[in-house]
Amino acid sequence: MKKQRIVVKVGTSTLTHDSGSLNLRSMEHLVRALADLHGCGNEIILVTSGAIAVGTARLGLSERPRELRMKQAAAAVGQCRMMHIYDKLFGEYNRSVAQILLTGDDVENPDRAEHLRSTFSALLEMGVIPVVNENDSVSSAEIETGHHKVLGDNDTLSAIVAALCQADLLVLLSDIDGLYDADPRTHPDAKRFHQVKDLTPEILEMAGGAGTWRGTGGMATKLSAARIAMESGCDMVITNGARPEDLYGIVEGQDIGTRCLARKKEDVL
């Protein structure tokens, strides 16, 4: 199997229970799969959501905060908790992790983006698994003020990271098995797209609204991420995060989820 540079994005609904507390069993299964793939020689970057949801539960709040400063507080508390668990779980497989928190300005500014690329490169060379999240404590302020470019969701962030790091594969672990011609949660006869070569207007029209209340990403954000990844020469797969063991087959090219095929380099140029 060819060694690959792989970016895996995991959503809030996969990482947490309905209460917002961390789903440790789900995290354990994900970490085991990523550690296995890393042990096979692949380079792994994990983009994780969930900071605000986890912080909300950790602070004993009854619902996701609406006030800006409370969102920032929840994000700070939740991110600390999540990194503690990731460090512990990956450590059980003798894997080191590094935290990277990003804002839109970090990837938009050419100088900062180049420094960021160098940091990723150094970490991967040393066998470290970068764990990436948007810096919600800062980015929330940007969303409110409009002073800076805002990433807004981790589907987009993961695609930007994949493009920046020239990844071979981006996998979005979601609460759905892939891209369908209708919402499979309300249409049992919905058909899954196995491969997507072009993001046609018809496909874009099929994308629904936001996902679960605990996250911000729906299918529309995933297709937006697919465009970024495909144009950078990176395959992207949308699949169900409830089955992290599917990552093994996805890396081998098996028909799992929906694979959005990278544009050929001559098409990108």
Predicted regions mapped to residue ranges:
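C-terminal catalytic "cap/lid" subdomain
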Residues: 1-269
